[in-house]
C-alpha cells in the first residue's frame, strides 16, 4: 500500500482511510491497528519491569531486597506486588496513595500494577496483531486462537486470582525466584498439584512437548534426499515447490510402532494445536477456581486413618503435612502485619493431623 501525495479527491480524504493506509502498509515491521495497542503497552510493561528490577526496593511492601541496586541478580530481582493493606487499588501515580510522588509510588508497589495491566493489554494486542495479519493475507486465525492460551493463563494468575483474594499482594511478583515462591504458595495454600485442572495443564504442556519432538523427528527422518548433502540443511533445495518429506512413509512407520498413526496432516496439526492450548485453558480455569478458594481433591478417609493409626501413611498424607508446614511458615513470614502466631499444637508433627 502507498499514501497518495497531492490534493485528495472527495473519496480519498477520509482520515480513517489515510491512517489505515499508513498503519497497514508493507514494511519491515508491520504496525497495523493492533500495533496502536501492542507497541505502547509492551514498551511500558518492559520498561517498568527493567526499571523496577534495576532500582526499586520491596522493603516497604515485603521487607525484601529485590533490585540489582540492592545486590540481587537476574534470578532474584523482581517487581514486587503492593502491600496487602492496599487491597485492590490501581495505585495510579496521581491517585490518593502516591499523590504524584514517583518515588513514593515505586515504594508502594505502583510499578507492579503498571507492569501487570500494560502487560495484559500488550498480550491482547499481540493476539489482535495475529488476527489482523491473518486477515490481511487471507489465513485462518488459528495462531491468534492458540495465543489465547498464554493470555488466559497470564490474566487468571496475575489479575483474576488476586482479585478473588484480599489484594494484589497475593499475585506473583514479576521475577524468577518470586514466581517460584508463588508456586510454593499455591501448593501450600491450595494443594495445587492435586487439582484436576493443574493435572490437565501438565498433561497438555508435556504432551505438546512430546508431540513436538515426535513430529520434528518424524519429518527429519522422512525427508526426501533432494541433494547430495549429508546433513538436513544441504539435502534439499529451499526453493523447491513440492513437498520435502513423505507423509506415507511416516504413517507406515508409526502404524508399525503404535498400531495407529495420523492419516492426514490436518488432523495431525490440529491435534498438536489442541493439546497445549486446551491444557493452558484448563490451567487458567483452575486458577479462576482458586481465586474463589475452590478446593482440590480431598481424600479425607486417608487423613482420618493417618491421624488414628501412626503406622498408616500415604504419599497423600505426607503431602498434606508438607502443605501445613508451608502454610505455617509462609503465613507468618509473608503477612507480618497480621501478627500470626501459631501455637505448637497446630504445627505439623509426625504423621498426625
Curated annotation (Swiss-Prot):
Primary localisation category: plastid
Binding site for pheophytin a: 130, 143
GO MF annotations, alphabetized: chlorophyll binding; electron transporter, transferring electrons within the cyclic electron transport pathway of photosynthesis activity; iron ion binding; oxygen evolving activity
Keywords: Acetylation, Chlorophyll, Chloroplast, Chromophore, Electron transport, Iron, Magnesium, Membrane, Metal-binding, Oxidoreductase, Phosphoprotein, Photosynthesis, Photosystem II, Plastid, Thylakoid, Transmembrane, Transmembrane helix, Transport
Positions bound to Fe cation: 215, 269
GO biological process terms, semicolon-separated: photosynthetic electron transport in photosystem II
Localization, UniProt: Plastid, Chloroplast thylakoid membrane
Catalytic activity of the protein: 2 a plastoquinone + 4 hnu + 2 H2O = 2 a plastoquinol + O2
N-acetylthreonine modified-residue sites: 2
Modified residues (Phosphothreonine): 2
Residues that bind chlorophyll a ChlzD2: 118
EC number(s) given by UniProt: 1.10.3.9
Family the UniProt entry places it in: Belongs to the reaction center PufL/M/PsbA/D family.
Name listed for the protein in its UniProt record: Photosystem II D2 protein
Organism whose genome encodes this protein: Glycine max
Gene: psbD
